[in-house]
Amino acid sequence: MSVDSLVSCLEQLITDDLKLVEHQEVSNGATWASALQSTKDVPSHALTKTIVLKPKTAKSQTVVPIILAALETTSTPSGIAAKAVGSKEARMAAADLVEEVFGIPPTDVGIFSVNKENASKVHVVLDAALIQHNGLLAFHPSSSAKTVFVSPAAVQTYLKSVGVNPIIVDFSAPGSATAPSKPAAQKKKAEPSKNDAAIENAALIGITVRKDADFPNWYQQVLTKSDMIEYYDISGCYILKPWSYSIWEAIQGWFDKEIKKLGVRNGYFPLFVSSKVLEKEKDHVEGFAPEVAWVTRAGTSELDEPIAIRPTSETVMYPYYAKWIRSHRDLPLKLNQWNSVVRWEFKNPQPFLRTREFLWQEGHTAHMTLEGATEEVHQILDLYARIYTDLLAVPVIKGVKSENEKFAGGMFTTTVEGYIPTTGRGIQGATSHCLGQNFSKMFNIVVEDPNAEIGPTGERPKLFVWQNSWGLSTRTIGVAVMVHGDDKGLKLPPAIALVQSVVVPCGITNKTTDQERNEIEGFCSKLADRLNAADIRTEADLRAYTPGYKFSHWEMKGVPLRLEYGPNDAKKNQVTAVRRDTFEKIPVPLNNLEKGVSDLLAKIQTNMYETAKAERDAHVVKVKEWADFVPALNKKNIVMIPWCNTTECEKEIKKNSARQVNGDEPEDEKAPSMGAKSLCIPLEQPSGEDAIIEGTTKCAGCGNLAKVWGLFGRSY
């Protein structure tokens, strides 16, 4: 479990005494105490220690490590802990054993590193003095750079929630008996909560919580169990595995071809930018300042001047645009780069949605006229919309950002906005900005105006170029996962799935001869070869698992189509296709295999988009009175209102619609928005009887005259 998921889990279980602080990485109790002393707002507490021991075990048996949590001041002989679990002796567990069980280095392990996934693989021993402590306890929440402060009761509540009955040991009386803690008296059944999210009889390889009941945990499980990502040891950074990176490659391949049709060419600019250059455009740098990561030292030497790691590349690229653009004949200049950027300042990272480093493309173009720049802004916006609709099967709304939400330092920003049905939140999908002449004036990107008259100096007047920037990131992947996934796991549109169909041999029993088995499996391999030859990405699953296990595995990974082939199918000269989106079974004749499978994949792609669009459309509601605004939001809608399009009104709408924070919804500027923010001003405005009547229609937010219909919603 990641630190963020753990904190979310603790917030759900514990109503009081939960506080989390960040500090430098520590390696022992002394450095930990020192780090906390230099950290602000640390409550009074007792330090703890968490030790992982390896009990003496016969070679024929599986090692079950002991995880021991105690007060830092308690002496904890390993022999006593070993005796408590029925072993003769124990020693410190090697780092590889710790990482195998908990997935993190030993220095990061805390009692909360025990979870539902590994609880059955460990013995949990608690120091009696820790349980009896009157006050807060300090633990590492699976990261040595963070500390969570909780009560002893909270520790026991958490362990109970993951199915652990810890062994309590009084280390001050070595001869005393040890026993599992007594279960608490049974309480009256509580109202349904996220604790009710568990899916009964869920296989260990499958998703164990319902999407609609515990969305954060569901999302984390889907990403890890489907093999899309691996959590990294730096918070907010993630490893993209082939199952997710292939989606980015599909997007990259499609978009790269399309922008080249517009005359865009690829290049690459350095990762680093000097503070002098970064700070040249005031509004721009203020928009990114809290998120900029700085390199201040090389080895043991302090740098003379700190160097920023790019949060975006306007200030990296534009000094060289000024050098390269010397004449109107050099225009338009259209460059794109595929790279990663770093944006550091936030507390609640989410894979793909809010990460400290992310992959994206950023296009930067320079034009002779505003008209030319504006035309390109909308061309790119249309391409972004097609990525969502045609590849990811996700509906989006095209619009213009408000003044408050536009790109820092830009003239105007266009956007494609998505919708996550489970949470009722909007999500920004991609943006295409017209920067106007702001940056060209800062960086002196000028040409002679070819349409102006030659002046007394023999030269034509100078013209500052018009610029655009536009970007789309791996956030696209997270949006698709959230929109399409279900309680079984991922649900991938065929257009972007690494594996579009999987062939599974069926009907093999104990009575099946080796020859029959080989014939069935061999034919499955040939079916996969046929489909791959027809450019249908296919695998044959010949692993020594049951068909049921394979079905669950590929359903969880979201493969659009499963093809079953067994003795009965052989008799009928067919395969049985099973759609991931509907679980409908369709026989496909072998003599029409390639076309039959291709047609089914096309139907799946279309159905996934239409299903998502119908869900989205049902939750875009028009509201003309403020009294109806918040009730509409609370029904998981995004809301269209007649709006005056002023920043003051926008801020009041967000403030007045904010709701009480609970559960997984942390309250910080970059966290999922509690109040409704302006998502966009849709390019397609309501018409007919809903059209804005100038001088008559009132703003639903403030009562002044409305200018446009604005789309508002809680958002990521």
Curated annotation (Swiss-Prot):
BP terms from Gene Ontology: cytoplasmic translation; prolyl-tRNA aminoacylation
Protein EC: 6.1.1.15
GO MF annotation list: ATP binding; Cys-tRNA(Pro) deacylase activity; proline-tRNA ligase activity
Catalytic activities: tRNA(Pro) + L-proline + ATP = L-prolyl-tRNA(Pro) + AMP + diphosphate
Cited SMART domains: ProRS-C_1 (SM00946)
CDD domains recorded: ProRS_anticodon_zinc, ProRS_core_arch_euk
Compartments in which it is found: Cytoplasm
UniProt xrefs under InterPro entries: aa-tRNA-synt_IIb, aa-tRNA-synth_II, aa-tRNA-synth_II/BPL/LPL, Anticodon-bd, Anticodon-bd_dom_sf, Pro-tRNA-ligase_IIa, Pro-tRNA-ligase_IIa_arc-type, Pro-tRNA_ligase_II_C
UniProt keyword annotation of Nucleus present: no
Sorted UniProt keywords: Aminoacyl-tRNA synthetase, ATP-binding, Cytoplasm, Ligase, Nucleotide-binding, Protein biosynthesis
GO CC terms in record: aminoacyl-tRNA synthetase multienzyme complex; cytoplasm; cytosol
Enzyme class per UniProt: ligase
Pfam families hit by this protein: HGTP_anticodon (PF03129), ProRS-C_1 (PF09180), tRNA-synt_2b (PF00587), tRNA_edit (PF04073)
Coiled-coil stretches: none
SUPFAM superfamilies: C-terminal domain of ProRS, Class II aaRS ABD-related, Class II aaRS and biotin synthetases, YbaK/ProRS associated domain
UniProt keyword annotation of Translocase present: no
Annotated region described as Disordered, given as residue ranges: 655-675
Family: Belongs to the class-II aminoacyl-tRNA synthetase family.
NCBIfam families, sorted: proS_fam_I (TIGR00408)
Protein name: Putative proline--tRNA ligase C19C7.06
Gene: prs1
